[in-house]
Amino acid sequence: MATYYSNDFRAGLKIMLDGEPYAVEASEFVKPGKGQAFARVKLRRLLTGTRVEKTFKSTDSAEGADVVDMNLTYLYNDGEFWHFMNNETFEQLSADAKAIGDNAKWLLDQAECIVTLWNGQPIAVTPPNFVELEIIETDPGLKGDTAGTGGKPATLSTGAVVKVPLFVQIGEVIKVDTRSGEYVSRVK
């Protein structure tokens, strides 16, 4: 893999630090009037998703990480692993609960997901930005009940719980933003 110096760090670059892959989220190159130039870099640890801020001297370097994002189709969950398929090669990959994280509640059969691979192993799964799910349980909305503006909780077909407006009923299909977990709209 390529070697990157700290002044080459840009948002989106994936590098290796301490034997683990990191993604550069922001980089600021600082050249003080006195002393050596340095880069203040915000990184995201790809294995856990935690954010770290580090300072690199201008002479510091890091190895590029062998990290690949692939568009794969979600097939099914067998209880232990979530299975995905590459639509071009029909090759199947299995991701464990650690790679899926909280995103399991947004996965629908045949949904296009972005699977992040490191050394050929899935380390993160990103569902589509928006999913359409059916409401299977929610309190009935009472006519004229507009005192509270907060809405009500609704359980969706995948088990996710989302706050929805009072007018939404059981059996309706709604659009949800998977990044924030918020209700977007009803689907006609």
Swiss-Prot record:
Pfam families: EFP, EFP_N, Elong-fact-P_C. GO terms for biological process: peptide biosynthetic process. Pathway: Protein biosynthesis; polypeptide chain elongation. The modification N6-(3,6-diaminohexanoyl)-5-hydroxylysine is found at residue 34. It comes from Klebsiella pneumoniae subsp. pneumoniae (strain ATCC 700721 / MGH 78578). GO terms for cellular component: cytosol. SMART domains: EFP, Elong-fact-P_C. This is Elongation factor P. SUPFAM superfamilies: Nucleic acid-binding proteins, Translation proteins SH3-like domain. It is found in: Cytoplasm. Belongs to the elongation factor P family. PROSITE patterns: EFP. The keyword Protein biosynthesis applies. Involved in peptide bond synthesis. Alleviates ribosome stalling that occurs when 3 or more consecutive Pro residues or the sequence PPG is present in a protein, possibly by augmenting the peptidyl transferase activity of the ribosome. Modification of Lys-34 is required for alleviation. May be beta-lysylated on the epsilon-amino group of Lys-34 by the combined action of EpmA and EpmB, and then hydroxylated on the C5 position of the same residue by EpmC (if this protein is present). Lysylation is critical for the stimulatory effect of EF-P on peptide-bond formation. The lysylation moiety may extend toward the peptidyltransferase center and stabilize the terminal 3-CCA end of the tRNA. Hydroxylation of the C5 position on Lys-34 may allow additional potential stabilizing hydrogen-bond interactions with the P-tRNA. Keywords: Cytoplasm, Elongation factor, Hydroxylation, Protein biosynthesis. HAMAP family: EF_P (MF_00141). GO terms for molecular function: translation elongation factor activity.
